[in-house]
Amino acid sequence: MAIQTSNLGYPRIGLQREWKKTLEAFWSNKIDEEQFLTTMKEIRLQHVKVQQEKGIELIPIGDFTYYDHVLDTAYMLGFIPSRFSEFTSYLDVYFAMARGSKDHVASEMTKWFNTNYHYIVPEYEEGLQISLKDNRPLRLYEEAKQELGVDGKPVILGPYTFLKLAKGYTQEQFPTILKQLVAPYVQLLSELHAAGAPAIQVDEPIFASLTKKEVQQAKEIYEAIRKEVPNATLLLQTYFDSVEENYEEIITFPVSGIGLDFIHGKEGNLNAISKYGFPADKTLAVGCIDGRNIWRADLDEVLELFTTLQKQVQTKDIIVQPSCSLLHTPIDKTEETHLSTELFDALAFANQKLEELVLIHSALTQGTESISNELETYRNVHHTIRSSAARNREDVKAARTALKEEDFSRPLPFEKRYELQQVALELPLLPTTTIGSFPQTTEVRQTRKEWRNGVISNEQYEQFIEKETEKWIRYQEEIGLDVLVHGEFERTDMVEYFGERLAGFSFTKNGWVQSYGSRCVKPPVIYGDVAFINGMTIKETVYAQSLTEKVVKGMLTGPVTILNWSFVRNDIPRKEVSYQIALALRHEIELLESSGIRVIQVDEPALREGMPLKEKDWDAYITWAVQSFLLATSSVANETQIHTHMCYSNFEDIVDAIRALDADVISIETSRSHGEFIDTLKHTTYEKGIGLGVYDIHSPRVPSKDEMYKIVEQSLEVCDPKYFWINPDCGLKTRRTEEVIPALEHMVQAAKDARSLLKTNA
């Protein structure tokens, strides 16, 4: 039995975010297309080289992208919306689909399963000619072979997952379109096989949550493909959960090997193997290193997994690999020497995870004595962090133990609260507001950098923040918004800002991961017990309120989003970490309220993305996620209005959860999903305050008043005007001032027109 190391995907962004910088330079016309392509090639090949040097045998090729791998697949198969037909060059079409243009809205963007990565949603249109427009994986495979002598493993998104992620067709059309994908996939795989690809990784993460009928449908497609490409080595790759429910059928698929996630789907996959075994003529690819977190592996536990598998599986070959692509982890921890020794030692970023794969390979092929020193080191590291004071705070345990049922609910029901709030706040019908942040200009970022580097004093920095806050309070007053925000100029990131002010968090210097397009985030590390220290938002919010007679919202990030957008300790349940965060935020909310802030927004944009992939596991997650929000927000007076915000979600799955949050007002992304949530509300009622975003802030285009009015009009068909709010989709941090002001002016005008119409019809 042969044992090989493999990787499923490598972070794209570059050690110093070279990828991001190159993209943004190209978009702003600072470099031309030739320079863009040259630099991207250098970055791409460097990533292959790193994996080669680390000792990975099956190196992924084609996981690199200029924006998003799902968008790559859509372009490759000809899923190009007709509204982009005026664009002729590849890059013009590609980036118009991703980002929109002056005259055309971008394709929708949404979360990649339950991660914090976003993909561009493929669009199907009637009359679409599906064909292999561009065999990009082949070009990149040949490039790595010619330039580096690397006989890599091409990575492609599988046909079933691709079409399931796409939109624009009816369920009745799905089988027909799926069959139309066979020919381009046959051509793609045939050409890769003919070029000598030793193995081809076909990603099908959707397989973790399919029905029996869907699995049979997928199998028929793979049989049709295999019939035409009988000799290619196809590795069917699943991840993010187990395939337990359909394992018996999946192992009969006509593929050469199957990749299973033994981190996030360990129990289910082991149960399935125990029950049904594994085909002796197939390769088992074992996802044994966590591709979604940053902690060192427990090597003893991993080796125990292989011992269990080797007792139950008499397979042809074994592949040792991460649980999923390393896209979700930072690249290398070597620059994080500012961290405490106990924390630094416990970390493993992408490059360290590759080293762990090689260690496991050595243990499996040469015996555990070959890595005895490393095993001892790992055991000591795990013991040190488990027993650290940061993970064993008595005050945090006491606060958790003292919680009572009444800590999780508001005193009065929504209708009675809202009446009191209307009297207290004196807002008009269809009140307007924004989601929280305003443009972080070059000046804002540069001033923050100077402050952090000690170039300017605390006093100078605070004066600058106050100046920006006052400027935008005046802008908001002039625009005519009803509920204002302070703008969040002091915040780099909506999670990092709070993590820096709570116990139990730590921060990397270079722990960047891709969120969407060129947007990278640096998730905090929750390594210890979370606890409140001092007020986090009081000063800036109270200052903003002192500048205006209008209502100013306090702005906080919710406990579940802080959890889901952080790298979280893995020694206690996520629910317990979420409750710790909620208790700390509860203290902050009480301080805001006692300081005179009457509207407090607690954002939960990541609540949906944390849901397990399998429907059977949803209730348990939703229960503690909702309880976390209620724990944070339920101690305020009835007159204090609690807002929340969500974005990029399949909300039809969680309408009941949204209702259970008991927020007085929720704002939801609507425009980029082309009105899907409006359709959801046609089939269910939502009887609390709600604002459906009227324009997409992720595109640089400024929408017209009429576009926004149309969304308001559609929204009022399904929402009670008494409870309806008007707002953008998300915060405006990434937009430019010259885009934001006219867009908000159009939004306020659309609100005025809608009010006038409602009064006329009253």
UniProtKB/Swiss-Prot annotation:
Top-level class of the enzyme under EC nomenclature: transferase
Residues that bind Zn(2+) = H645, C647, E669, C730
Show the active-site residues: H698
Q: Sorted alphabetically, which InterPro entries does this protein's record hold?
A: Cbl-indep_Met_Synth_N (IPR013215), Cobalamin-indep_Met_synthase (IPR006276), Met_Synth_C/arc (IPR002629), UROD/MetE-like_sf (IPR038071)
Query: According to the lineage, what is the superkingdom?
Result: Bacteria
Per the UniProt record, which EC number(s) apply here? 2.1.1.14
Q: Which keywords accompany this UniProt record? A: Amino-acid biosynthesis, Metal-binding, Methionine biosynthesis, Methyltransferase, Repeat, Transferase, Zinc
Cofactor(s) the protein needs: Zn(2+)
What pathway does the UniProt record associate with this protein?
Amino-acid biosynthesis; L-methionine biosynthesis via de novo pathway; L-methionine from L-homocysteine (MetE route): step 1/1
Q: PANTHER family from the entry?
A: 5-METHYLTETRAHYDROPTEROYLTRIGLUTAMATE--HOMOCYSTEINE METHYLTRANSFERASE (PTHR30519)
The protein depicted here goes by the name 5-methyltetrahydropteroyltriglutamate--homocysteine methyltransferase
The species this protein belongs to is Bacillus cereus (strain ATCC 14579 / DSM 31 / CCUG 7414 / JCM 2152 / NBRC 15305 / NCIMB 9373 / NCTC 2599 / NRRL B-3711)
Q: What is the lineage of its organism?
A: Bacteria, Bacillati, Bacillota, Bacilli, Bacillales
